[in-house]
Amino acid sequence: MSESVLLDEIFTVTSVDKQKYQRVSRITAVSGQNDMNLTLDINSQIYPLEKDATFSLQITSNLNSPDLKEAADYIMYGKVYRVEEAKDEKVSVYVSFGGLLMAIEGSHRKLYRLSLDHVYLLLRR
């Protein structure tokens, strides 16, 4: 894993909520090992996801590697605005991508590299 890659996981969509806004869906997903939970707002017109879809999620500090950009189907730039301790030695990290929000909860061992800073989110099927 590249030094700029802060998180690299495979997730499966457990639900899709399309009710809030046009062209925006809020998905909930669980990682392949069921140790991380994700809630993510996405532009469903550009990158539609359905229940039970599997996708790769990477969070990086930069896009200096051309391989990262070329492999991704959907990229967002945002800011980690809150990191808090959750129950059972878990951490919750909150990111805003220009109003599209992400919350991810998981083990401190996997999320420790995410801090209050700007990040890139890369998704691919």
UniProtKB/Swiss-Prot annotation:
Coiled coil: none
InterPro entries in the cross-refs: NA-bd_OB-fold, RPABC3
Positions of the UniProt region annotated as Non-specific ssDNA binding: 17-39
Subcellular location: Nucleus
Major subcellular location class: nucleus
Domain of life of the organism encoding this protein: Eukaryota
Keyword field: DNA-binding, DNA-directed RNA polymerase, Nucleus, Transcription
GO molecular function, one term: DNA binding
Pfam families: RNA_pol_Rpb8 (PF03870)
GO biological process: transcription by RNA polymerase II; transcription by RNA polymerase III; transcription elongation by RNA polymerase I
Any one Gene Ontology cellular component term annotated for this protein: nucleus
Family: Belongs to the eukaryotic RPB8 RNA polymerase subunit family.
SUBUNIT field: Component of the RNA polymerase I (Pol I), RNA polymerase II (Pol II) and RNA polymerase III (Pol III) complexes consisting of 14, 12 and 17 subunits, respectively. Directly interacts with POLR2A.
Function of the protein: DNA-dependent RNA polymerase catalyzes the transcription of DNA into RNA using the four ribonucleoside triphosphates as substrates. Common component of RNA polymerases I, II and III which synthesize ribosomal RNA precursors, mRNA precursors and many functional non-coding RNAs, and small RNAs, such as 5S rRNA and tRNAs, respectively.
Name of the protein in its database record: DNA-directed RNA polymerases I, II, and III subunit RPABC3
